[in-house]
Design a protein with these regions (language model features):
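Terminal low-complexity/intrinsically disordered segments and their adjoining alpha-helical capping regions
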Residues: 1-136
Length: 136
């Protein structure tokens, strides 16, 4: 669905199918074309990345594989040091992090609603277990 906004994707593929691609745990949307891939990989923001590591399509399961090591190696370390952390990321990365932190099942994640642009605050124990969460 690279390059399509949600409304255009719904018109082309149907609302239910787009919902499944956007929200399910292990269903990938259609892979991007070589032309689409070349266009966004030409963007200088991606120059530092190994192009072979960039997927043609990605499910939430795939995103989780990328997000959790970053949580473990970086974010959690700052929190364990007593620092406050602000995470600003793409919705699917946030969804993966929420799935991990709240232990949301693969089946339940499809209906999990995340407000766009609204700060979500987590209160955690010293062991980084969720005590509470709320939107500002």
């Amino acid at each position: 669905m690279q390059g399509l906004n949600k409304d255009d994707a719904r018109k082309e593929f149907g609302e239910e199918q787009v919902h499944i691609w956007r929200r399910s745990y292990d269903v990938k949307p259609p892979a991007e074309t070589e032309e689409q891939r070349e266009a966004y990989l030409a963007d200088r923001r991606y120059n530092h990345l190994d192009k072979r590591m960039m997927p043609y399509s990605e499910s939430l399961k795939d995103t989780l594989v990328r997000v959790i090591p970053f949580w473990t190696d970086h974010i959690s370390q700052y929190l364990l040091d007593g620092q406050t952390v602000l995470v600003s990321a793409h919705g699917n990365s946030i969804r993966a992090l929420i799935k991990y932190l709240e232990d949301v099942s693969d089946e339940d994640i499809i209906n999990y609603e995340i407000k766009t642009g609204a700060p979500l605050v987590y209160e955690l124990t010293d062991d980084l277990e969720v005590i509470d969460k709320y939107y500002l």
